């Protein structure tokens, strides 16, 4: 993510997604590998990636590297209302990759309840947090995973270490809400342009995938595409191609 101050207390949020669709052609050898695997599989202490490691390294938004990205920019007023959206295909240079385990030492509920925290990006993180809270309230939905616990497994010298992490931290909410926003907005753009996408919807507790947009009751949005994880889900890679075609006026 990026945050840029604008005039009169407003600011611009950038949601930047790695863009492997710019380099993986449909029906190419790499595309066939991704299509066969469909998604990354996560196992205790290991994972089987959808794409080869060399391709992941090539397209990952790593700090201090100029990388291709599909970005959504939101111009946000001082009351955290979105007043403008713009999608771009671009190259970006990431200043810093922030990691959850180190970030949560500073950016947590306790620090926010005290009114602030010390971090190089404390101002940007605080703005993103307030924006995420506003977006969650607008959807009329809260994160149902707050009380769930994730476990990570590490194997070293034949010894297994299990660590637990409770979901629902401030950084979880920021990432979740901005991903919901970008997937909803890109789904809206595809719908308005009459371009086919793969949509995820929910009604009466049943979730389905379809090429026709429909409301997602669980998230409280009018339409929702999977498009924010094109490195680990094939559906997202397909949708990213459609969004790129829309922006390039190729569809």
Indicate where each model-derived feature is located.
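Electropositive polyanion-binding surfaces
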Residues: 1-251
């Amino acid at each position: 993510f990026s945050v840029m101050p604008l005039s009169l207390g407003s600011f611009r949020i950038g949601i930047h997604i790695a863009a492997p669709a710019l380099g993986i052609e449909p029906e190419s050898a790499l595309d066939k590998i991704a299509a066969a695997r469909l998604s990354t599989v996560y196992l205790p202490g290991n994972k089987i990636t959808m794409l080869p490691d060399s391709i992941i390294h090539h397209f990952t938004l790593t700090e201090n590297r100029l990388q291709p990205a599909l970005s959504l920019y939101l111009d946000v007023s001082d009351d955290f209302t979105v007043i403008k959206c713009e999608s771009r295909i671009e190259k970006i240079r990431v200043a810093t990759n922030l990691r959850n385990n180190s970030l949560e030492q500073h950016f947590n509920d306790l620090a926010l309840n005290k009114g602030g925290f010390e971090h190089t990006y404390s101002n940007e993180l605080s703005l993103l947090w307030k924006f995420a809270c506003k977006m969650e309230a607008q959807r009329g939905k809260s994160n149902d995973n707050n009380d769930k616990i994730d476990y990570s497994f590490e194997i070293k010298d034949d010894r297994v270490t299990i660590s637990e992490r409770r979901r629902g931290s401030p950084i979880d909410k920021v990432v979740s809400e901005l991903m919901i926003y970008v997937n909803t907005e890109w789904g809206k753009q595809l719908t308005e342009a009459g371009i086919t996408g793969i949509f995820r919807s929910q009604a009466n507790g049943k979730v389905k995938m379809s090429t026709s947009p429909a409301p997602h009751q669980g998230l409280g949005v009018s339409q929702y595409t999977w498009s924010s994880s094109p490195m680990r889900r094939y559906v997202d890679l397909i949708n990213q191609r459609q969004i790129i075609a829309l922006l390039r006026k190729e569809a």
